[in-house]
């Protein structure tokens, strides 16, 4: 257990009291798995005491759970910049703590990380990313979590080809989850804007204008005329810039498909729409990494600590 001096120095850094929330069993399990893996690479007595506390926490121990998560929140908050830069030697607060009314249990994460080999360091980074993502998700609405799930599943695919099962699973969830469509569209647009920004796209590009156009659609009163006007506006956006229209591929099958009774894209929208190479969108999505997903908490738009390799 920490000395009083150590406890006091740590406690002065607490920015706000811990707000109790119900036990998130997924997050608790992730922290326990993290501790179990760290136990393999360290025999430090302080860590063993901390690990013992973690092992004893379950879904019935709400106060203990919140103290545990509060320690991780503080660790991430104080070390955000260093972790984002992968600078594990420059942590402001090297300890992960579990605070009680009478003192604090903690272990030196920095020492544990630096003294292990590179393979174990990669495992530790994966744990940190996973725990941080779960902590960030606690205050997200279901629509945001659904969009995050889509991007995460796309990121985890080796090649972003059509995956019928993935599409069916995601659409089934969409049908059964009773999402707010307006919130879902805005969450998707926000995620797309974030992704493009992190990939170096200019905010003046046609794609950003496209996102803004879709984001402002009145979903609650969306008529067929609104749909036609939206498609026409999107075509105009890409016509003005000379960029490829990303709607060509999906709309060509809707209005074409060899059926001569269906209107053509050219007759419906009198704007030039150069064909989009098959690999453009896929190549962009392949660049998605943990580092390029941003934090939605507060005004900071970054949250990950280590890019996927």
Curated annotation (Swiss-Prot):
A Pfam match: DUF5891
InterPro entries: DUF5891
Source organism (scientific name): Invertebrate iridescent virus 3 (IIV-3)
Protein name: Uncharacterized protein 054L
Domain of life per record: Viruses
